[in-house]
């Protein structure tokens, strides 16, 4: 019998966790979580009615065929076997008797969980009728016969619930995890329901339907314990059981409450996310549904804002409502109510069109009750299903579709409304019957029933034009009809097997027939309301019946789920079999190869290619006629769509509709071009262009960066320009999706001004063709203009500006008009236009001297925006001016690098072309009036520095004293000027900017005072030899006549009797070959220095025209002999390749350029000839500037306009922008607790090692008598603030040693228990590096020691108590400390005082003043770091003597004695050192990094391209506000702490080249954006790639027996928002890099010079301290040097002028720096920027520069 039972249930596998079940589970659409008692009663009633209609099982059957039980029965439960059941078992009638309870009397027979053995356990009573476990698993089970009782009366009493033992139900599975408890409770509740205990299950309010009996409570308690072991119960369940072991009812009540709450929220979210609406249901019902869901979610704490709700609604719109997605997506503040207004409007429009069509014939009385109309929309040859539902639920979108295509699970649209205005007949499950129906499941095997289908019923569909059925047993007069073409709602073909009649026999004995199509490939049997209407049958959804026009009711309509159904019992069966239907006239296409199959076989080629290949017999075996091509045209291969995806095609001329929709200047296109590399820093690197859609008018604006505020200013400017000049308002701006356009600032600006941003789609540049093509055209013109004119590249934007002016004036071939004509502007007057780069002579209206020439050669660029003048580039003055005072030089050659002024010819054409304009200017000029001169030289000046590489077209030749120009030279020079070939430099200094030609709105009230030391931004020439250098007395014999007549053009600032001076030759870039500077007595020189000293505001501190170090010497700082060679010698500076000499023509060799002595101060250029311009002339320039500022017109971005004063510094490019405040980094725990290392450690081997370390530490504590073992104190007796918590920490050292440490919780130590004044000192890293450097130079022996348990040697003075270690088992006792336990606040200080006293008294050492933990005597130097000691000495025996003395008191271990003459490897405080005495020392961390970096979980790329530098210039951090979840934010901050912590450790140890990047990234630890994390990953990747790099020290071989200590300083001026200046210093001892520092400036600097002064002032204190340390450790003389690449800073340091600093913020710092330099005998020297290795500490550098500056000292 048992085998028969098992054979009847093949779905129950052997060994499954479920017991065998003789009854099928009831399939229902009821929510499985809805298990309240009220619904259980309905469920039982439905089951009883359904079973009463089933046939009984024959006696010979082992298992009844009826899957439903006659009445509720107690369940028979098999015993658990600590896992899956080994065999299926069922309870018999005899095993369910009361005697079976005896097993519960012996708990040993059942595998109880621990809490079952509690005193609360009790067995059931003797009268209990509940089942029990069988006595043996293998007992045969008998099956009761059907006659033994298969029907019972339905009763709700407890007694009647237990009157039968015939039910066999599936027990719940064993609970195996706390996370599975919610699902397990569902099965357990179902188990109770099947066991006739549904009445005791708590309802929603937490109360059961009836009172539970004692036996039921016992059964409930015991089964819960058996199937829910205590170790797998959730915490909240355990809490309930800890109060009352039997309170299972409370657990069930809370579980049901949780399930119902979670289910409702989940269902609402899913429904809202899958909304679908196409107008098939009333709009008001759809709105009610959506608003109800949103309200419920908001009430439950899930807030859905308007934006999200509108997006979800619009995503589900289809049909005529779909266009709302595109018309509404631009409205950011749209509400749900506004959206529904549009939906209602469309719905009402649809209803109006439907009412015009014929409706179903209905009873007039019904039309009064039912206001809805059901339109008969018949579609020939198309079956679409859209049933009318009073609950406004939307029909399935693919009900009449091929089931195989949709995996037998048609998608359900979730815009159904749960309730309707009229309540129809509703079936909650298949067993609910109404109107006397007898629901009998059809015996026909339907194909692919859908989950939500009501078996045995037809689905009413108002949208279907034909009736379709899957079963052939109801089709009469079947015949094939291959001409029928039926498609589903998705336009897919549905194969039809046959056509026939569907005959109905209704309740009034009337018979009706309609046409029906047979197909097995649909999800539902569809009954078309259209065909019923053709036979005078109408569906009345008010009464939910099918009726005739006279009101005769034919059949009821049943609502099940979201749809309406009619029972198949009204259908008359036929005698036609299914095979007959399927084989009648099979379509010819079924014998052909389907096209999708051929398409896939032939590598997914297109249909045209396949068909052509078959025609030409390139593919054999079958012909073209063998393939079914019917679906080839419409077939869409999903794999092809994915694999062959391309961008959409842009249709030519598709944008024309916008031209008709918008007026001029309402629709703009914009785009940004750039950056342009290898340009001066002050020149614009970008430009932004705008194009009007209608007129094609263009605008261009220069940009220095792409920051959002710069873009915003340009947008503000052009919008105001269009509004004021053209009286138009911009409505739409089209742009790409660059961050400069999509940022929040610009978005808010556009929204505020009512402008709609129109963005291109992702990776679709062709959609932005107007702007892209304009940029390409302008760049083509730019390159051509620069090539033709020969002008330098930094004037590239002037070429863009010129091209824009011309292009706006040229006619378009399409429109036959120019952009200016479309805009209503006059055509371009070509008489006002000059060729780009046309040579001209500009009039100097304010020369320095009356005898100086009045003309300056220049090159015309483009007409001015702000005046009637022309923008002209003056190469001699290195600036551009806006003027009308120019004369055209007509010549055959106009290229700048080819123009020959000796071959000038008069060009009649050009002169005739510009004659009218020149006459117009002449007629309007007023002679001898400077006030009316429209030239604005100061406004538009652009001063140029020297390029790092010497310009090949600029004469810069130093003149020796013997080549001084005699007095007669001046006359000769004057004669040669007319023959000089004037050429503009091809390469210019980094601070040039053609954007300077436009005025600035923001002007400084104080003019920039230029001076001889200006770095180029002030328009001055640099000097090859500083004026402050000592002057040779050998030049006193030179004549001063030439000096007076040539150089001192403005000498009114000096007394008239200053005549006794000589000339010192000075070379200046672009100056004369022979220039002299007057030399006077020492007093006179000092007096002039006061006037000539550079302004503190002077900008860039570099002078790249110099290629050698220039020391600045004073009588106090330098010895008489030249010390520059001794200071620079042996420094690891890069080797620069020699620069090739500049090739000049013969004419250039003969005479200097014009600008050598024809500069004019009013134009802003001050060369050597006017280096001594007086203060009065500068004041006059200021007045002129202020006058011109008032009349200037500003028409574009103020941030892109150059200031009146020359730029004070070069533009600094940071790697990232700094934040305003940075909090301290939270330390990261790297140790393990006791429970982690021992208690719960699953690694047995590691656990054993930690146990050994634990016992070792305990023994050491006892050995050192750490606490008082004579007495244990009660916790209540001691003051709580003197009680210190203690713990064991475990860690694994890099060498593999497992270590345990017993520590005190000093972090919660009370302040009264220690002295805050005591400090624990360790050796400073600079002191260690200094000691190592001296050891390398002096062949010292290096010995490394370790003192075990160092802190325990120090006694503790305070009265402190701790809890004993865990192994003592005295948790309620305290012990008093006697030693300084690790972790106490005072332990470090106590140990320092202890070891310091011992070293001084017993070892004869003394501590170096100012350097804690550095001890020395005449032979040995000791560096102390807690318990680690490093000994340095010339004699190894001296080290051994110290070791012997230490061992007398402390447990001292020798880590490395250092006695070998070969290479010795050390691991000193994290540094891996390789040392060979007398040769070299290498410092690195390769092994440590190889171990630590992979543990950081950073995505490393070991085989990919290695990074060549830690960062590149030009990267900025996006300053937008982060939007992160709290947990995600904390996780990322924690990750940043780990990464930056490791990088900082490596950087400050020896990788000083990374300090800038580490410092700037550390400022963003609390701003962990994706960009910051990516940059951090790149830094870690670079450290990983270069982990084998080492700091290399070779033994120095000094020429003199002295130590040389040098600091190289640098600073980068932060002149951008969110930036502060960055300072950096590198310290070198005898040519070895021993330390570095990179940090933000603590003071706000207003210029580069201020930043340089601040950097130097920060380096001097440490330099002096290191000098003292070196002198203490090594008694040799010491030379101290300070190197900087800022000549202006050097001038300030040694200047005696103090007046100029009184009003300066940093004046005090500068004057203090002077005193320190003078008092500490510092040699201040100049170093070239190219050789300044401190550059890596202040700014990100290009790869080539970074390598050049670091490869000498770290590799």
UniProtKB/Swiss-Prot annotation:
Keyword Cell inner membrane attached: no
Motif range (Bipartite nuclear localization signal): 1178-1212
Misc. comment: Retrotransposons are mobile genetic entities that are able to replicate via an RNA intermediate and a reverse transcription step. In contrast to retroviruses, retrotransposons are non-infectious, lack an envelope and remain intracellular. Ty1 retrotransposons belong to the copia elements (pseudoviridae).
PROSITE patterns: ASP_PROTEASE (PS00141), INTEGRASE (PS50994)
MF (Gene Ontology): aspartic-type endopeptidase activity; ATP binding; DNA binding; DNA-directed DNA polymerase activity; RNA binding; RNA-directed DNA polymerase activity; RNA-DNA hybrid ribonuclease activity; zinc ion binding
Site (Cleavage): 401-402, 582-583, 1217-1218
Region (Disordered): 1-93, 126-173, 352-421, 956-1170
Described function: Capsid protein (CA) is the structural component of the virus-like particle (VLP), forming the shell that encapsulates the retrotransposons dimeric RNA genome. The particles are assembled from trimer-clustered units and there are holes in the capsid shells that allow for the diffusion of macromolecules. CA also has nucleocapsid-like chaperone activity, promoting primer tRNA(i)-Met annealing to the multipartite primer-binding site (PBS), dimerization of Ty1 RNA and initiation of reverse transcription.
Region (Integrase-type zinc finger-like): 583-640
Signal peptide stretch: none
Residues annotated to bind Mg(2+) 1: 671, 736
Organism name: Saccharomyces cerevisiae (strain ATCC 204508 / S288c)
Active site: 461 (for protease activity)
Keywords: Aspartyl protease, ATP-binding, Cytoplasm, DNA integration, DNA recombination, DNA-binding, DNA-directed DNA polymerase, Endonuclease, Hydrolase, Magnesium, Metal-binding, Multifunctional enzyme, Nuclease, Nucleotide-binding, Nucleotidyltransferase, Nucleus, Protease, RNA-binding, RNA-directed DNA polymerase, Transferase, Transposable element, Transposition, Viral release from host cell, Virion maturation, Zinc, Zinc-finger
Reaction(s) catalysed by this chain's protein: DNA(n) + a 2'-deoxyribonucleoside 5'-triphosphate = DNA(n+1) + diphosphate; Endonucleolytic cleavage to 5'-phosphomonoester
Single Gene Ontology BP annotation: transposition
Annotated Polar residues bias: 1-10, 48-60, 127-152, 1005-1015, 1054-1082, 1095-1106
Subunit structure: The capsid protein forms a homotrimer, from which the VLPs are assembled. The protease is a homodimer, whose active site consists of two apposed aspartic acid residues.
Chain sites annotated for binding Mg(2+) 2: 1346, 1427-1428
Main location: cytoplasm
Residues bound to Mg(2+) 3: 1610, 1652, 1685
Protein name stated in the entry: Transposon Ty1-LR1 Gag-Pol polyprotein
Domain RNase H Ty1/copia-type intervals: 1610-1752
Record-annotated Integrase catalytic domain positions: 660-835
Biased composition (Basic and acidic residues): 1038-1053
């Amino acid at each position: 019998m048992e085998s028969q039972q098992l054979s009847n249930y093949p779905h129950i596998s052997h060994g499954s966790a479920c017991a065998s079940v003789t009854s099928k589970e009831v399939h229902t659409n009821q929510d499985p979580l809805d298990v309240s008692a009220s619904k259980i009663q309905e469920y039982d009633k439905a089951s009883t009615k359904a079973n009463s209609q089933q046939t009984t099982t024959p006696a010979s059957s082992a298992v009844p065929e009826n899957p439903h039980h006659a009445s509720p029965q107690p369940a028979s439960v098999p015993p658990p076997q600590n896992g899956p059941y080994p065999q299926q078992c069922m309870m018999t009638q005899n095993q369910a008797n009361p005697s079976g309870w005896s097993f519960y009397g012996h708990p040993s027979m059942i595998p109880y969980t621990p809490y079952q053995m509690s005193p609360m356990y009790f067995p059931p009573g003797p009268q209990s009728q509940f089942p029990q476990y069988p006595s043996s698993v293998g007992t045969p089970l008998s099956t009761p016969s059907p006659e033994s009782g298969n029907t019972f009366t339905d009763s709700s009493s407890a007694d009647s619930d237990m009157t039968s033992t015939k039910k066999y139900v599936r027990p719940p599975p064993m609970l195996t995890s706390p996370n599975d408890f919610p699902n397990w409770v569902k099965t357990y509740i179902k188990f109770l329901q099947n066991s006739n205990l549904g009445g005791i299950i708590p309802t929603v309010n937490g109360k059961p339907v009836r009172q539970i009996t004692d036996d039921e409570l016992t059964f409930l308690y015991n089964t819960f314990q058996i199937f829910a072991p205590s170790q797998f119960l959730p915490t909240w369940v355990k809490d309930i059981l800890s109060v009352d072991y039997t309170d299972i009812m409370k657990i069930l009540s809370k579980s049901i409450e949780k399930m119902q709450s979670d289910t409702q929220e989940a269902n609402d979210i899913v429904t809202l996310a899958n909304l679908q609406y196409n107008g098939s249901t009333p709009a008001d019902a759809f709105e009610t549904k959506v608003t109800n869901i949103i309200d419920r979610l908001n009430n439950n704490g899930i807030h859905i804002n308007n934006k999200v709700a509108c997006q979800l609604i619009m995503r589900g719109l289809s049909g005529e409502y779909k266009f709302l997605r595109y018309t509404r997506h631009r409205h950011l503040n749209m509400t749900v109510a506004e959206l529904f207004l549009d939906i209602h409007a469309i719905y009402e429009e649809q209803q109006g069109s439907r009412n015009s069509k014929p409706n179903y014939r209905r009873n007039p009385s019904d039309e009064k009750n039912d206001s809805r109309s059901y339109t008969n929309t018949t579609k020939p040859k198309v079956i679409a299903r859209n049933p009318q539902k009073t609950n406004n639920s939307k029909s399935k979108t693919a009900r009449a579709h091929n089931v195989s295509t949709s995996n037998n699970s048609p998608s359900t649209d979730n815009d159904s409304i749960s309730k309707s205005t009229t309540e129809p007949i509703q079936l909650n499950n298949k067993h609910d019957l109404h109107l006397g129906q007898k629901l009998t499941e059809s015996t026909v095997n339907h194909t692919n029933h859908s989950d939500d289908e009501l078996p045995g019923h037809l689905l009413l569909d108002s949208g279907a034009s034909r009736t379709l059925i899957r079963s052939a047993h109801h089709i009469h007069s079947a015949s094939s009809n291959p001409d029928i073409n039926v498609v589903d709602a998705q336009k897919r073909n549905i194969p039809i097997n046959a056509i026939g009649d569907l005959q109905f026999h209704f309740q009034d004995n009337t018979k009706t027939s309609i046409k029906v199509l047979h197909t097995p490939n649909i999800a539902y049997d569809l009954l078309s309301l259209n065909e019923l209407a053709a036979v005078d049958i109408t569906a009345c959804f008010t009464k939910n019946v099918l009726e005739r026009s006279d009101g005769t009711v034919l059949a009821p309509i049943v609502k099940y789920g979201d749809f309406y159904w009619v029972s198949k019992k009204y259908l008359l069966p036929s005698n036609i079999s299914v095979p007959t239907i399927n084989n009648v006239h099979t379509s010819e296409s079924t014998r052909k190869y389907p096209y999708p199959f051929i398409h896939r076989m032939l590598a997914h080629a297109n249909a045209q290619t396949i068909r052509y290949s078959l025609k030409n017999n390139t593919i054999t075996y079958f012909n073209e006629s063998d393939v079914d091509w019917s679906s080839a045209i419409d077939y869409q291969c999903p794999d092809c769509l994915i694999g062959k995806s391309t961008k959409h095609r842009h249709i030519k001329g598709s944008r024309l509709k916008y031209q008709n929709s918008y007026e001029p200047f309402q629709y703009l296109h914009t785009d940004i071009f750039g950056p342009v590399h290898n340009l001066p820093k002050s020149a614009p690197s970008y430009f932004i262009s705008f194009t009007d859609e209608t007129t094609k008018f263009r605008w261009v604006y220069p940009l220095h960066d792409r920051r959002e505020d710069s873009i915003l200013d340009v947008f503000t400017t052009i919008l105001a320009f269009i509004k004021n000049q053209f009286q138009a308002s911009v409505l739409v701006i089209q742009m790409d999706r660059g961050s400069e356009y999509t940022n929040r600032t610009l978005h808010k600006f556009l929204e505020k001004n009512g402008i709609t941003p129109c963005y291109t789609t992702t990776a679709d540049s062709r959609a932005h063709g107007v702007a892209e093509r304009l940029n390409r055209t302008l760049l083509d013109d730019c390159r051509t203009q620069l090539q033709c004119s020969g002008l330098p590249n930094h004037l590239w934007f002037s070429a863009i500006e010129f091209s824009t002016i011309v292009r706006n004036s040229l006619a378009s071939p399409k429109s036959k008009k120019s952009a200016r004509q479309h805009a209503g502007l006059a055509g371009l007057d070509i008489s006002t236009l000059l060729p780009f780069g046309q040579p001209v002579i500009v009039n100097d209206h304010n020369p320095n001297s009356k005898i100086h020439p009045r003309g300056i050669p220049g090159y015309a660029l483009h007409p001015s925006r702000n005046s009637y003048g022309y923008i002209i580039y003056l190469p001699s003055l290195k600036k551009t001016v806006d003027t009308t005072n120019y004369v055209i030089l007509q010549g055959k050659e106009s290229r700048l690098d080819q123009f020959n002024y000796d071959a000038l010819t008069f060009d009649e054409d050009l002169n005739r072309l510009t004659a009218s304009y020149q006459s117009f200017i002449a007629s309007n000029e007023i002679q001898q009036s400077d006030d009316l001169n429209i030239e604005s030289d100061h406004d538009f000046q652009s001063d140029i520095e020297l390029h790092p590489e010497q310009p090949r077209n600029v004469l810069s030749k130093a003149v020796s004293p013997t080549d001084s120009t005699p007095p007669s030279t001046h006359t000769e020079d004057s004669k040669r000027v007319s023959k000089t070939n004037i050429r503009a430099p091809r390469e210019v200094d980094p601070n040039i900017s053609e954007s300077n030609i436009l005025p600035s709105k923001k002007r400084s009230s104080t003019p920039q005072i230029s001076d001889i030391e200006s770095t180029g931004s002030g328009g001055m020439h640099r000097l090859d030899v500083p004026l402050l250098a000592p002057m040779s007395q050998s030049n006193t014999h030179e004549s001063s006549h030439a000096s007076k007549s040539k150089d001192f053009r403005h000498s009114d600032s000096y007394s008239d009797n200053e005549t006794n001076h000589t000339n010192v030759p000075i070379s200046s870039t672009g100056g004369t070959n022979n220039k002299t500077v007057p030399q006077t007595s020492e007093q006179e020189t000092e007096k002039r220095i006061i006037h000539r000293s550079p302004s503190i505001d002077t900008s860039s501190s570099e002078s790249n025209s110099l290629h050698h170090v220039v020391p600045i010497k004073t009588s106090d700082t330098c010895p008489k002999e030249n010390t520059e060679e001794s200071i620079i010698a042996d420094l690891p500076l890069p080797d620069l390749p020699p620069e090739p000499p500049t090739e000049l023509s013969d004419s250039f060799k003969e005479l200097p350029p014009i600008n050598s002595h024809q500069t004019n101060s009013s134009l802003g250029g001050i060369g050597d000839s006017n280096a001594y311009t007086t203060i009065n002339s500068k004041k006059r320039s200021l007045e002129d500037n202020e006058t011109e500022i008032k009349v200037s017109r500003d028409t574009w971005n103020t941030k892109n306009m150059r200031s009146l004063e020359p730029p004070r510094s070069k533009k600094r490019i940071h790697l990232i922008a700094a934040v305003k405040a940075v909090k301290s980094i939270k330390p990261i725990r790297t140790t393990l607790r006791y429970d982690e290392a021992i208690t719960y450690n699953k690694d047995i081997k590691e656990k054993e090692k930690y146990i050994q370390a634990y016992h070792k530490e305990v023994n050491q504590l006892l050995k050192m008598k750490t606490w008082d073992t004579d007495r244990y104190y009660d916790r209540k007796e001691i003051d709580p603030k003197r009680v210190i918590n203690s713990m064991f920490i475990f860690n694994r050292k890099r060498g593999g040693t497992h270590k345990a440490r017993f520590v005190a919780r000093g972090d919660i130590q009370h302040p009264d228990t220690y002295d805050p004044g005591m400090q624990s000192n360790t050796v400073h890293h600079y002191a260690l590096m200094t000691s190592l450097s001296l050891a390398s130079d002096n062949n010292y022996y290096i010995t490394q020691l370790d003192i075990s348990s160092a802190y325990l040697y120090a006694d503790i003075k305070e009265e402190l108590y701790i809890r004993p270690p865990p192994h003592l088992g005295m948790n309620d006792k305290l012990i008093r400390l006697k030693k300084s336990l690790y972790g106490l606040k005072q332990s470090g200080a106590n140990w320092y005082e202890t070891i310091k006293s011992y070293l001084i008294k017993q070892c004869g050492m003394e501590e170096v003043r100012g350097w804690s933990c550095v001890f020395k005597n005449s032979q040995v130097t000791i560096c102390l770091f807690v318990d680690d000691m490093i000994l340095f000495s010339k004699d190894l025996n001296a080290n051994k003597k110290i070791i012997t003395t230490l061992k007398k008191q402390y447990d001292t271990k020798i880590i490395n004695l250092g006695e070998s003459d070969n290479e010795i490897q050390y691991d000193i405080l994290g540094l891996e050192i390789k040392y060979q005495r007398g040769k070299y020392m290498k410092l690195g961390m390769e092994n440590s990094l190889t171990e630590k970096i992979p543990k950081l979980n950073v995505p490393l790329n070991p085989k990919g391209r290695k990074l060549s530098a830690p960062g590149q210039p030009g990267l900025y951090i996006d300053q937008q506000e982060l939007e992160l979840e709290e947990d995600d934010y904390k996780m990322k901050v924690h990750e940043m702490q780990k990464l930056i912590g490791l990088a900082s450790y490596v950087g400050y140890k020896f990788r000083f080249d990374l300090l800038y990047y580490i410092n700037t990234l550390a400022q963003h630890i609390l701003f962990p954006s994706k960009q910051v994390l990516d940059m951090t990953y790149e830094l870690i990747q670079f450290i990983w790639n270069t982990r084998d790099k080492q700091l290399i020290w070779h033994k120095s071989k000094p020429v003199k027996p002295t130590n040389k200590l040098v600091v190289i300083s640098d600073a980068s001026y932060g002149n951008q928002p969110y930036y502060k200046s960055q300072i950096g210093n590198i310290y070198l001892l005898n040519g070895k890099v021993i330390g570095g520092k990179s940090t933000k400036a603590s003071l706000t600097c207003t210029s580069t010079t201020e930043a340089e002064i601040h950097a130097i002032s920060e380096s001097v204190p440490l330099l002096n301290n290191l000098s003292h340390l070196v002198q203490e450790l090594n008694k040799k003389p010491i030379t101290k040097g300070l190197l900087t690449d800022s000549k202006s800073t050097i001038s300030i340091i040694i200047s005696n002028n103090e007046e100029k600093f009184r009003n300066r913020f940093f004046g005090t710092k500068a004057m203090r720096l002077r005193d320190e330099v003078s008092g500490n005998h510092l040699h201040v020297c100049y170093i070239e920027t190219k050789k300044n290795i401190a550059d890596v500490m202040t700014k990100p550098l290009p790869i080539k520069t970074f390598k050049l500056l670091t490869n000498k000292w770290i590799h």
